[in-house]
Structure formats: structure tokens, C-alpha cells
A protein has these predicted regions:
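C-terminal ends and interior cores of transmembrane alpha-helices
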Residues: 83-97, 289-302
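Extracytoplasmic gate region of multi-pass secondary transporters
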Residues: 27-28, 210-264
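Conserved MFS/SLC helix-loop-helix module at the cytosolic interface between two early adjacent transmembrane helices
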Residues: 60-96
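Cytoplasmic helix-loop-helix junction between adjacent transmembrane helices
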Residues: 105-142
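Flexible cytoplasmic inter-helical loops of multi-pass small-molecule transporters
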Residues: 181-203, 397-405
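Helix-to-loop junctions at the C-terminal end of transmembrane segments
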Residues: 60-73, 267-278, 365
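C-terminal transmembrane helical hairpin of 12-TM major facilitator-type secondary transporters
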Residues: 279-326
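Helix-loop-helix hairpin linking two adjacent transmembrane segments in secondary transporters
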Residues: 139-184
């Protein structure tokens, strides 16, 4: 009975993540339509995604400084955040006619999403023991991949107006908010003690070697991940156009397959591996494979479509397979009473890096072409692999040593 309830809550948390995060790349998937309707430039297209990332960072940093994820009932914070993300996306679909309106709304969407993804991690951790936490985080991150890729699926299934795509994503996020409010509950491993705000913990946690190495590994992973997700469809489209290949019409489906299907499967497999063989070897293996894909990407740019798709499936799976290991490792090494704050701070810094690479990739493409643009991402997984290889095999929490104060 207890096991059934645990599995049910995990599944519901993952479902809410898929629904709530479907708004993340909704505007990015609509870029081809917006180019003709708004005269959108590559820089403007980059800002449609980067503004979400910046909003996410601001929201996550604010949440971390206020210890919000540890002070508010997580299911309520999740529901309100998903509803706000839905409202901002719906407003963009109904009222936006250019970047002057779209970018502020995308920024606010990012702020709202800071209460969806990190809080989902906290809730998933509350329903997980250390022996299966990697698998649980893998499922959650697979939900992130599916939700993020969903707009590509909508675009790939037919020539829908971009406003319809945005409204569909907004509706899904609103449904996720209702589910979070009505049926999601915190698990038995959630520390429910009230926390006196201690913003210093955001900095103090980096003093511990295991936490620091885990974070560096995560930052290397993030240097690659979101820039790849943002510009993958452009990479595919440019290569197919150079080949004069009819498969260019199916760019959205290829992107969904690599990001959503392969990414989801890779997340679950990576989470399982982190439980079976350890966080460190699971993360290092994924980082090495995705780094190799970065280096090999120019050779597949104009490869036959079947070869390209197989390559992108491997890359899509490996680029996110290590995420569960990072989240799990941090939840096990950071102060257990402030795990929500630690995860939020880690995520905020990682997403700040994504703003840099999201802007740099199209700049590189303008200089050397899309064939070589993704070489820019290779240093991330290389640095991440080195950091994770140095991680102690059995890192432990530093709760007893942290300068944190509580009300009882």
C-alpha cells in the first residue's frame, strides 16, 4: 500500500512537470513562424529563449535567498507557479505582436518556472530513499525533457499557427497547476521544520569539496544542454537544406525525438545507473559521450538523414542522462534541512550559464556556419567530467557542520 502510494505520487509529480514545463520552449518552437510574421532576427530569436532563462535565474535566486522552497508548502508553490507560467504564455499568445511584448512575458514565464522545476525536485526527493533517489530524479528529469520538447511535437504534427501552439502549452501548464493543488502531497522524507532564512547557505555550501565538485560538474553539463536544445532544430534544418533534403519538413519531429523521447529515456537510464553503479561513474560516462558528440557534430551535419537521426538520439540521451546524478548527489551532500535551497541555488547558477551559450551558438554559426557551431559546447562536458571524476566515491551530507538556525 505504501509502495503503491509512493509510486503514485512520483508519477503525479512527473506528470505535473511535463505539463508545467511545456511552456518553456513554446516560443522557441514557433521561431520559424515568427521570423516571417515579426521579421525576427537570429538575435531576437535567441532572446525569446534567453529571457526565460534569465527570468528563471532571477526567480530561483530570489527563492534561494528567501529559502522559499523550504518555507512554503511545496505543492502550493508548485501549483501557483505553474498557473502563473500558464497565464504569461496565454497572454503572449493573445496579445503579443513583437519582441517588446513577448520578451517581458517570457521573462515572467521564467520567473514562474523557478517554482516548478526545483520544487518538483524537492517533492520527488521527499518520496525517495537514498537507494532509489537516482532513479526518481531520472524520471523527473525525463519529464523535464518531454515537457520541454512537447512544442516541437505540436509543430511537427502539422502547420499550426504559432498562437495555437502557445495556447496549447498554456492549457497544459494550467492543468498541471490543478493537479499539483488537488492531489500532490509531500512525502515522508520531507523535513517539515520551519527554517529561519539564511541566505549565506547559498555561498556556504560551496565550501564543502563534494558539494563544490558536484556543482562544477553540473555547470559543465548546463553549458551544453540548453544551447543544444535551443538550437538543435536550426542545426538540423540548416544541414538538411544544404543537402536539399525533403526531411527538412520534419525538423520538429526530429527535435522532439532527440530532446523528448531520447532525452526522457536517457534520463531514466542515467538515474537507474546512478543508483546501480554510483553517481560519479554514471555522470562521467554521460559527460564523455555527450562531449564526444559535440566534437563529432560537424561530421553529421550533412550526413544521410537516418545517420543524423541516430546520432542525435545518442546525443539527446547522453546530454541529459547525467542530470539525475547531479541532483541526487547534491541532495545527499548538502544540508538535508536546506536541500530545496541548495537545489534551487545550483539550478540558478547553471541556468545563468545557459544564457551565455544560447547567445554564443548563433554568433558562432554566423562566423563559421552551423556545421561547426556546436563545437563551442564541448568544453562544458569536458570540465564536468573532470570534476565528477574527482568526486569522492561515497560523499556524505555536511548537515552537522553547517551554520544554520531553526525554529522548533
Amino acid at each position: 500500500m505504501i509502495r503503491s502510494r509512493t509510486d503514485g505520487q512520483r508519477s503525479l509529480i512527473a506528470l505535473v512537470q511535463i505539463l508545467g514545463l511545456s511552456v518553456w520552449f513554446s516560443a522557441t518552437a514557433a521561431v520559424p513562424s515568427l521570423r516571417s510574421e515579426w521579421g525576427l532576427s537570429p538575435t531576437g530569436a535567441g532572446w525569446l529563449t534567453a529571457s526565460v532563462q534569465i527570468g528563471f535565474v532571477i526567480g530561483a535566486v530570489t527563492s534561494a535567498l528567501l529559502n522559499l522552497a523550504d518555507r512554503v508548502k511545496p505543492q502550493h508553490l508548485l501549483a501557483v507557479s505553474a498557473a502563473c507560467a500558464a497565464a504569461c504564455t496565454a497572454m503572449l499568445a493573445c496579445f503579443a505582436h513583437g519582441l517588446s511584448t513577448a520578451i517581458p512575458l517570457r521573462f515572467l514565464t521564467g520567473v514562474a518556472l523557478a517554482g516548478v522545476y526545483p520544487v518538483g525536485m524537492k517533492l520527488m526527493a521527499s518520496w525517495s530513499q537514498s537507494t532509489d533517489r537516482g532513479r526518481s530524479f531520472g524520471v523527473l528529469i525525463g519529464a523535464l525533457a518531454l515537457g520541454s520538447a512537447f512544442p516541437h511535437l505540436i509543430i511537427g504534427l502539422g502547420p499550426l499557427p504559432w498562437r495555437t501552439v502557445m495556447m496549447t502549452a498554456a492549457t497544459l501548464s494550467a492543468v498541471g497547476a490543478v493537479i499539483a493543488l488537488r492531489v500532490i502531497l509531500p512525502g515522508p522524507h520531507l523535513d517539515g521544520r520551519a527554517v529561519i532564512p539564511n541566505p549565506r547557505y547559498v555561498v556556504a555550501m560551496f565550501a564543502e569539496r563534494a558539494v563544490r565538485l558536484t556543482n562544477v560538474g553540473y555547470f559543465g553539463h548546463m553549458w551544453e544542454l540548453y544551447a543544444l536544445w535551443t538550437w538543435l532544430s536550426m542545426f538540423v534544418l540548416a544541414g538538411r537544406n544544404e543537402r536539399e533534403d525533403e526531411a527538412a519538413a520534419f525538423t520538429g519531429l526530429v527535435a522532439f525525438g532527440a530532446i523528448g523521447i531520447a532525452g526522457g529515456a536517457g534520463s531514466v537510464l542515467g538515474g537507474w545507473a546512478s543508483d546501480r553503479i554510483g553517481r560519479r561513474p554514471a555522470a562521467v560516462t554521460a559527460l564523455v559521450i555527450s562531449g564526444a558528440c559535440c566534437v563529432a557534430s560537424p561530421f553529421f551535419f550533412t550526413a544521410p538523414t537516418v545517420a543524423l537521426v541516430l546520432f542525435l538520439l545518442v546525443w539527446g540521451a547522453s546530454v541529459i542522462a547525467d542530470s539525475g546524478a547531479f541532483s541526487t548527489s547534491l541532495s545527499e551532500t548538502a544540508d538535508k534541512r536546506l536541500v530545496g535551497t541548495a537545489l534551487t541555488a545550483q539550478t540558478a547558477i547553471g541556468f545563468l550559464l545557459t544564457v551565455v551559450t544560447i547567445h554564443l551558438v548563433p554568433v558562432a554559426a554566423g562566423l563559421v556556419g552551423w556545421r561547426y557551431a556546436f563545437l563551442l559546447l564541448a568544453p562544458g562536458p569536458v570540465i564536468g567530467a573532470v570534476a565528477m571524476a574527482a568526486l569522492p566515491r561515497f560523499p556524505t551530507s555536511t548537515t552537522a557542520h553547517s551554520d544554520i538556525h531553526y525554529r522548533t
